[in-house]
């Protein structure tokens, strides 16, 4: 599995693109807020010929979901996350005002609910969703046993 890390937005947060030899990929936490960040993510995916199969969120705090509408528009992907965090989507506009800015795009609803133990497959790679409530009630980490790595 190959990994590309981006650091996005004013908070900042990490976004990961994971892919394997099949060029199937997942994007984790697309926190791209600024237009140049969105273009950097899109350009990387396009230039590497990646076929993004899943958009995964570790949790749904504001800084981790900025790019979800962009991913839906550009790649037709709805986010996958734990249902216990879904309320954060409705809170996003209010949260952004608390931090002194407006969202550029309205948050989009989740496409799939992930649960503890769910397996996400892309190409020949498998990630296990592990529910780790604490930072947020629906926090998930994604573990790749074959490569001994975890994304949180």
Task: Name every feature range the model reports, one short phrase each.
Residues 23, 32, 62, 85, ...:
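Short, glycine/acidic-enriched loop or turn micro-motifs at the edges of active sites
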Residues 1-2, 99-102, 123-127:
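Short Pro/Gly-enriched beta-strand edge/turn motifs at strand-loop
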Residues 25, 55, 78, 131, ...:
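Hydrophobic "anchor" residues on beta-strands that sit immediately upstream
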Residues 33-38, 42-121:
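Active-site HxH/HxHxD metal-binding segment of metal-dependent hydrolases
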Residues 1-48, 141-152:
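Conserved beta-strand hairpin/beta-sheet module of binuclear metal-dependent hydrolase folds
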Residues 16, 91-93, 124, 142:
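Short, well-ordered secondary-structure micro-motifs
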Residues 18, 29, 59, 71, ...:
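Divalent metal-coordination and catalytic microenvironments
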Residues 118-144:
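Core dinuclear metal-dependent hydrolase active-site scaffold
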């Amino acid at each position: 599995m190959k990994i590309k890390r981006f650091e996005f937005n004013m908070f900042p947060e990490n976004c990961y693109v994971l892919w394997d030899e099949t060029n199937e990929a997942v994007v984790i936490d697309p926190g791209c807020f600024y237009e140049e960040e969105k273009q950097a993510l899109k350009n990387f995916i396009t230039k590497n010929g990646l076929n993004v199969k899943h958009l995964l969120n570790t949790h749904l705090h504001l800084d981790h979901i900025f790019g979800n509408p962009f991913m839906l528009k550009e790649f037709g992907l709805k986010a996958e996350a734990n249902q216990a965090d879904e309320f954060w989507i409705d809170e996003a506009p209010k949260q952004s005002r608390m931090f002194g800015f407006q969202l550029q795009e309205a948050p989009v609803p989740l496409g799939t609910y992930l649960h503890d133990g769910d397996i996400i497959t892309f190409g020949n790679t498998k990630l296990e969703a592990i529910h780790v409530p604490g930072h947020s009630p629906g926090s998930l980490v994604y573990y790749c046993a074959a490569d001994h790595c975890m994304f949180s």
